[in-house]
């Protein structure tokens, strides 16, 4: 009996060690900056491949050096990097929002949002601001924050945009940037100059996204690994994966929101957009793009996308 008890205790200890080790691995695999190989130059190359109609504008922007970069300092001392581009002085717009804050996705960088920069700047006549999120691009940080900590950095960028341009603004994000946008939207201290939000293929929560990827990539259930990993992350960074909830923040959002999602998205699965849309209690629109996978709605429907956003931003 004593030998059986000792054997059981050893097995339990080994299981705990295995789970803790797996949790550290998951944190490192999914969220450590050191695994990001994406660069700004790769982003420019992908833009040329996916959005060739924007190249004349982008080449002009780069050749003339009018895309300005800047750094700001967060309250905790982190340096955050971003780009901005003023609207053409003679470019008229009917949009109520004259400035767009454009937020990139997971393991991307600010330059990845230049296709929407083209849409807002060239097609809609807006100023644009494109931040590098925490642990992305030229911003400080070693671990990706899945939008939750990023929402507070985005709030800083909204204030920077207001100090630069003094105009009403729209916040528009893609993928993790869309989750950041939605998480920002429920903050109590939103700047009054934010008039609209646009989220394109964002997830309901960090928990839901990780649970799906754990199943898809490793064929593992959420329990117990994801629960333990979330606790580990909380000890490291002060928030859990369930706390990082876009759906709870959207329910508090007082501003109009446009929801966009590809109906063939299996990375942030399409089903997520429905509870998000339902949670928003104010003015809202939902647009599903037919046959589109993750984050490619503007790529395959550029005219319709531009028209949808233009119509949404009408006063």
Model-derived segments and spans:
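An N-terminal hydrophobic leader/cap segment in hydrolases
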Residues: 14-73
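Short beta-strand/loop motif that positions the catalytic acidic residue
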Residues: 252-254, 259-261, 265
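Catalytic histidine-centered segment of alpha/beta-hydrolase-like enzymes
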Residues: 292-302
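Conserved acidic catalytic loop of the alpha/beta-hydrolase fold
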Residues: 152-168
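Short alpha-helix in the alpha/beta-hydrolase fold that links the catalytic acid
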Residues: 116, 246, 255, 269-278
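Hydrolase active-site cap/lid region
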Residues: 183-239
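Membrane-embedded segments
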Residues: 74-157
């Amino acid at each position: 009996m004593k030998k059986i008890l000792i054997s059981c205790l050893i097995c339990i200890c080994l299981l705990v060690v295995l789970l803790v080790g797996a949790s550290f691995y998951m944190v490192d695999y999914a969220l450590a900056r050191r695994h990001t190989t994406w660069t700004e130059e790769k982003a420019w190359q992908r833009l040329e491949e996916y959005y060739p109609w924007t190249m004349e504008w982008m080449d002009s922007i780069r050749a003339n050096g009018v895309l300005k970069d800047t750094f700001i300092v967060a309250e905790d001392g982190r340096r955050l990097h971003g780009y901005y581009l003023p609207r053409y002085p003679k470019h008229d717009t009917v949009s109520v929002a004259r400035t767009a804050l454009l937020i990139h996705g997971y393991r991307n960088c600010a330059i990845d949002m230049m296709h929407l920069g083209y849409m807002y700047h060239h097609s809609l006549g807006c100023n644009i601001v494109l931040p590098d999120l925490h642990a992305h691009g030229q911003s400080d940080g070693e671990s990706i924050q899945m939008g939750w900590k990023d929402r507070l950095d985005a709030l800083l960028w909204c204030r920077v945009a207001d100090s630069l341009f003094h105009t009403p603004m729209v916040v528009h994000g893609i993928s993790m940037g869309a989750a950041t946008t939605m998480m920002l939207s429920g903050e109590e201290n939103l700047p009054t100059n934010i008039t609209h939000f646009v989220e394109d293929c964002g997830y309901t929560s960090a928990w839901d996204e990780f649970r799906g990827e754990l199943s898809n990539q490793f064929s593992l259930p959420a329990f117990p690994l994801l629960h333990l990993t979330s606790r580990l992350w909380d000890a490291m960074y002060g928030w859990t994966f369930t706390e990082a909830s876009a759906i709870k923040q959207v329910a508090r959002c007082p501003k109009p929101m446009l929801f966009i999602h590809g109906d063939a998205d299996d990375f942030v699965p399409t089903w997520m957009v429905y509870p998000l849309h339902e949670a928003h209690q104010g003015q809202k629109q939902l647009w599903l793009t037919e046959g589109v996978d993750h984050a490619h709605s503007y790529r395959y429907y550029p005219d319709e996308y531009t028209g949808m956003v233009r119509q949404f931003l009408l006063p």
